[in-house]
């Protein structure tokens, strides 16, 4: 594999702009090659190419890293004029000094320093959490044979915690953890838990499956909170109340800390990957430059970079440390891991941090040798292997078999479905086939079509480098390691999901074909419902690869239940995303009423939308569910914008479907027509504007090259490497999407102005429903792309790892027992990880917060809203926690990394 492809495969999507632009460098070298060849042809004399002293070796050693070079300093170096030709000196100045060092290396080094700053802050939080965990474990050990209230335990725990916060916290963690680990408490088991009652068991099952209802965190104090400072607002909530700490056990705390440490360890691996692959890229780029321009700059460049840039210093220290360890292993010398890592913190901080958290994970958070062995094995699986793609994907690529089944199944199904559509459209309008079979089976077709188009969306995101899996799942699961960042089609699991969907499409096509042929709904309608139920409940061994889609089946069922009970649960990505998709499936949902009407005593000719109120009620449900989700988001975060405005939008959606139903039931009377047109017009205008401005973040930019578009357009391909602009032809897809979305939003006009025969036609309803599904297909592409853009601007690559104990600002010792209620539940990402712009010379301009709690001083309402609009889409949901807190010990992963990919 070429290094450029390897860099593309290994690059973390959210950090892609911070890597060395290797392909641009190759294009520059090709241009230099052409100039050199042209000069060689024009030259009549032989030109000797001799190795030289570096152009920038003497002139730049006096320059501090990060400061810009003056042209006079560079051109005044004596070595600059001595050995190279004029063209060579021009290339060295333009490529190595102006582009590679001043731009590319400075960019990578500054971002690496920012990552190190973030790693240190998260490490301090975890260090504090381990200290509290040790105190709690000591407390429970000392009070094992006597009872004490949970409130007293929390108070004494944090009193001791505040008293013990000092510079020697690392040593206290080590000593405290060793005093309670299995070494000094041989095989000590926790007190036997009493048998759970039926109610407690049901609550536990619901909590494990994210189905336990919860009160909004800010629901009862929302009016008072509206006047509080913005720093206390916008916090996310999960399925835990303010008294979370009062019921926290050491096992629950250990599980939460284990998940947080795993995610932090994986984050360190990603930082190390970023550093190492960039160092390799710079070395290879200078080597290519030497080969193209006949120079010998590699040695001097590497020496200069190791001296002046932290990126190269740490990479070189890591190589030396690995070599030292290998030498000690081969010579059978003891390796003082702790002492060595402590001495290397300044030289190689990533390795030092890895050593510390490995010690915590395998010692402080284990109760037995078995737990230690399990945790050690778990960390080993998280180590990045650059050859993972070639070794695992191409040798045992099961996706080939899965795609073969998909191709055969969908190919046959499309033939049968097309024929049934022909029969339904060509049948008489009063026939059972046209009025009953065509709408009912058409509703199933819409559900399967939107599922198939969603997987097409996944392929588009996969090809354009959009990290949709992080957005969908909320975080990187530990058992999957770093495979999400390996850009191979087999690792995307798209073939597996298509394989899963094929088992629903093929039976639907066969059953619908038989139903149309026999002109009967019974028993084929019930048969297909039974097949769908069986496929969701099917044991893993009956269908090949069915054990690989257990999580998918469970996720669909759980998310659908959470959607139907919107308002009782915090809104996660899957909840709001599935809700938006179902808003485009009102045609299918309304058919549920028709299905029951067919088997009731009602005549079949009265089961259509022109006679059924139930169909109108069901068509309002998707908008109602999203309305309740918006209210829950407002109750959780306390931010009226954009959640209340979004709720108003879905209120118009309910009004639109209700007035459409009333208009149909009134036999298209003028009295009902006017309210319908008013509601439909308002709904279309607001939803179209919301799609473009809020969900897609369009129509903000009127000055740059991308008129009305964002600055980052992943579907437009690569930017021009010379001027940084996108090709206009590639940007047209965004403008077409904007026009398409607006046009389909106004498709209701057909019901208002078309002749009555067209309005009442089942074919018209089917076509309009199909257009809405296609509009949603386009909407999904740009909605997820916009979410990815937000993650890129925030450099967000991990989810929220919940922590068992309150956290304070890093370096802030002012937390006391009064904070237990307000900070009872925290996450590793609650701390301010952005470096200070005043104290850090390598700072980044991050985007404006996606939401604001209170209006800041000297800012108007309009100014606050206008600043929030570009990032408001990120507040539609809150990221799920890493794991549900329970009393179970960490379980062994059900499948290996290889099995999870294949």
Curated annotation (Swiss-Prot):
Isomerase is among the record's keywords: no
Ranges facing Extracellular side: 426-435, 519-522, 576, 754-761
InterPro entries tied to this protein: EXS_C (IPR004342), SPX_dom (IPR004331)
Transmembrane segments: 405-425, 436-456, 498-518, 523-543, 555-575, 577-599, 733-753, 762-782
Membrane-topology annotation of the record: Multi-pass membrane protein
Residues in the Cytoplasmic compartment per record: 1-404, 457-497, 544-554, 600-732, 783-902
Pfam families registered for this protein in UniProt: EXS, SPX
All copies of domain EXS, residue ranges: 606-815
UniProt biased composition (Acidic residues): 892-902
GO cellular component, one term: fungal-type vacuole membrane
Residue ranges that the Swiss-Prot or TrEMBL entry lists as coiled coil: none
MF (Gene Ontology): inositol hexakisphosphate binding; phosphate transmembrane transporter activity
Keywords annotated in UniProt: Cell membrane, Membrane, Phosphoprotein, Transmembrane, Transmembrane helix
Domain SPX: 1-303
Region span, Disordered: 882-902
GO biological process: cellular response to phosphate starvation; phosphate ion transport; signal transduction
Location of Phosphoserine modifications: 172, 179, 859-860
Record's subcellular location: Cell membrane
The UniProt record lists the keyword Glycoprotein: no
Miscellaneous notes: Present with 1160 molecules/cell in log phase SD medium.
Family: Belongs to the SYG1 (TC 2.A.94) family.
Function recorded in the entry: May function in G-protein coupled signal transduction.
PANTHER family named among the record's database cross-references: SOLUTE CARRIER FAMILY 53 MEMBER 1 (PTHR10783:SF103), XENOTROPIC AND POLYTROPIC RETROVIRUS RECEPTOR 1-RELATED (PTHR10783)
Name of the molecule in the record: Protein SYG1
Natural source organism: Saccharomyces cerevisiae (strain ATCC 204508 / S288c) (Baker's yeast)
Organism taxonomic ancestry: Eukaryota, Fungi, Dikarya, Ascomycota, Saccharomycotina
Gene of this entry: SYG1
